[in-house]
Amino acid sequence: MVDLTPPFRPATPDDAQALAELVDFASEGLAPYLWAKATGPGGDLWAVGRERARRETGAFSYRNAVVLEREKRVAAALIGYPLPDAPEPIPDTMPAMFVPLQELENLAPATWYVNVLAAYPGERGRGHGSALLALAERIAAEAGIRALSIIVSDSNTGASRLYERTGYREVARRRKVKEDWHNPGTEWVLLLKRA
């Protein structure tokens, strides 16, 4: 990974609560919906989120995260990693909610995938998103990856504007499968940026 200097630093397991909260913001409530399903009625969905953030492996792991600190507190985070060089087969057992997301990821092989980009509400509008996206480009370049990818909800206009302003362009869309997750969007949008 690139050398990180303040305000950036690699995430640690101690950042699990902040990472879970930021994943909630970035996913527009999808992550807590899934965590609640994993815990069952009366379970602690945030415990599931923290546990996933503390994992050593997997997409949502502190090892794939960089945090941006302000006044010694996590203000924002980036979670990202390289996508495989070839599309991954979509198994029949994959939950329907994930199929459109996997289809879009499969359209962006060999890119550096920005899985999560989020800031706490009080920290928005301060340039953290742009700074973290620039850092993502540095990380990708150091890894020899020539393009970056992001998937965003069509209803997340603020994030979409940020991505467009920083050079990302729409490539494809897939209809969301929501089950009982309440979200105003209807489609997932894949954006790419060539380095």
What are these regions (language model features)?
Residues 54-67, 83-88, 113:
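A short helix-loop-beta-strand connector motif used in the catalytic cores of GNAT acetyltransferases and
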